[in-house]
């Protein structure tokens, strides 16, 4: 059985409420997701965008990120990622630097194959970076064919799509018309980022899911920060949710206290 951990929206270097403590919290949450990957002994980690909170992260944040990804390399676990809208730059991306560190790779329209330790249960993983709105209508969604028809296929994207994302949340695209109908083949699954709530659905026979963010980015985000453990066996993909808190780190994620004040 091949196992892949799906992580998204880590927003490293986010100094929420102007607090350095929160910057550390986001880094700790990413570390916790790696704790889970190592604990589960997964065959790869996929990250579906917004690794960093903005295009110009601080040097300490980049170094902490590399240290965390280095833990995956020490465990022999590849780190496969796409670029989100928050960290996106005009030309070369942060993933182009990070991928120079051994086990990291920036996903593309060509498949990256992941298998279990014995070479069984192959998965072809694809990635499309966050697409700028003016480029959406003319974007070419053509993917290279997988090496074999027996591969499970996963496409990673960083977009808001209906029906998983409510219409009032950021003007989401229609998943069937705006994405799936424009692909040259339907993947087994669509692993998504950008939406910070954990949710899933099946659309046109494709399993579609958001793991949500690894830390709480807004006070209005009340879900449990989580990652997905994807299990692939005999051509079938199943999914299990693991809360970031199950890594066992103190105050990761940090609990919020909401106080309503009547005037």
Regions found by a protein language model. Give the residues of each.
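His/Asp/Glu-rich metal-coordinating catalytic cores
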Residues: 55-209, 213-231
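Generic structural motif
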Residues: 15, 131-133, 160, 233-235, ...
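N-terminal active-site segment of His-dependent metallophosphoesterases
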Residues: 1-68
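Generic beta-strand hydrophobic packing signal
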Residues: 45, 190, 240-242
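Generic beta-strand structural signal
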Residues: 6, 47, 202-203, 232
């Amino acid at each position: 059985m091949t196992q892949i951990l799906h992580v998204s929206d880590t927003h490293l270097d986010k100094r929420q409420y102007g607090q350095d403590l929160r910057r550390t919290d986001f880094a700790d949450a990413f570390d916790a997701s790696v704790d889970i990957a190592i604990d589960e002994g997964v065959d790869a980690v996929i990250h579906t965008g917004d690794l960093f909170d903005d295009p110009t992260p601080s040097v300490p944040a980049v170094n902490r990120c590399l240290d965390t990804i280095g833990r995956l390399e020490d465990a022999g676990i590849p780190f496969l990622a796409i670029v989100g809208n928050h960290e996106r730059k005009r030309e070369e991306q942060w993933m182009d630097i990070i991928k120079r560190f051994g086990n990291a790779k920036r996903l593309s329209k060509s498949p990256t194959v992941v298998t279990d330790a014995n070479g069984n249960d192959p998965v072809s993983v694809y990635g499309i970076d966050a697409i700028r709105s003016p480029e959406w209508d003319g974007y070419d969604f053509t993917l290279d064919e997988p090496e074999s028809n027996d591969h499970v296929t996963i496409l990673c994207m960083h977009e808001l799509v209906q029906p998983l994302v409510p219409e009032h949340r950021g003007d989401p695209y229609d998943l069937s018309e705006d994405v799936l109908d424009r692909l040259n083949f339907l993947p087994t699954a669509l692993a998504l980022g950008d939406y910070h709530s954990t949710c899933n659905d099946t659309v046109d026979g494709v399993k579609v899911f958001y793991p949500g963010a690894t830390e709480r980015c807004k006070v209005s985000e009340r879900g449990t920060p989580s990652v997905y453990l994807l299990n692939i066996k005999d051509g079938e993909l199943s999914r299990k949710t693991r809360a970031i808190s199950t890594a066992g780190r103190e105050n990761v994620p940090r609990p919020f206290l909401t106080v309503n004040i009547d005037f």
